[in-house]
């Protein structure tokens, strides 16, 4: 338990931010799973939209500091390469 008002506030903020960050990570993982599933199924119709959505989610996570920018770039690069190889 925090002894100072400011410490209590920081604890509340930490809980809220953790929830937001976990939600963002979850959306990134879900988008990644959908994209990988489409790549493995060779679903060429859904692939461009899923890749666009995945890239968007990953860059939003990187922009807000949930994941590192290098990690985001690596994920996008690898999955883009896999997606283009299925065509």
From Swiss-Prot:
What is any one of the record's Gene Ontology cellular component terms?
A: small ribosomal subunit
Please provide the record's keywords in A-Z order.
Answer: Ribonucleoprotein, Ribosomal protein, RNA-binding, rRNA-binding
Q: Which GO terms describe its biological process?
A: translation
User: What are the protein's GO molecular function terms?
Assistant: small ribosomal subunit rRNA binding; structural constituent of ribosome
Keyword match Lipid metabolism = no
Q: Does the keyword RNA-binding apply?
A: yes
Q: Where is this region: Disordered?
A: 1-29
InterPro entries registered for this protein in UniProt: Ribosomal_bS20, Ribosomal_bS20_sf
Comp. bias intervals (Polar residues): 19-29
Q: Where does this protein have compositionally biased stretches of type Basic residues?
A: 1-15
User: What role does this protein play?
Assistant: Binds directly to 16S ribosomal RNA.
Name the PANTHER family for this protein: 30S RIBOSOMAL PROTEIN S20, SMALL RIBOSOMAL SUBUNIT PROTEIN BS20C
NCBIfam families on file: S20 (TIGR00029)
Family classification: Belongs to the bacterial ribosomal protein bS20 family.
Please report the name of this protein according to its UniProt entry. Small ribosomal subunit protein bS20
Organism of origin: Bdellovibrio bacteriovorus (strain ATCC 15356 / DSM 50701 / NCIMB 9529 / HD100)
Q: Taxonomic lineage of this organism?
A: Bacteria, Pseudomonadati, Bdellovibrionota, Bdellovibrionia, Bdellovibrionales
Gene for this protein? rpsT
């Amino acid at each position: 338990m925090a002894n100072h008002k400011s410490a209590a506030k920081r604890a509340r903020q930490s809980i809220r931010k953790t929830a937001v960050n976990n939600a963002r990570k979850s959306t990134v993982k879900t988008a990644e799973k959908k994209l990988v599933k489409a790549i493995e199924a060779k679903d060429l119709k859904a692939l461009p939209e899923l890749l666009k959505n995945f890239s968007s989610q990953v860059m939003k996570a990187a922009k807000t500091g949930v994941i590192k920018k290098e990690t985001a770039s690596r994920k996008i690069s690898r999955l883009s390469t896999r997606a283009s190889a299925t065509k």
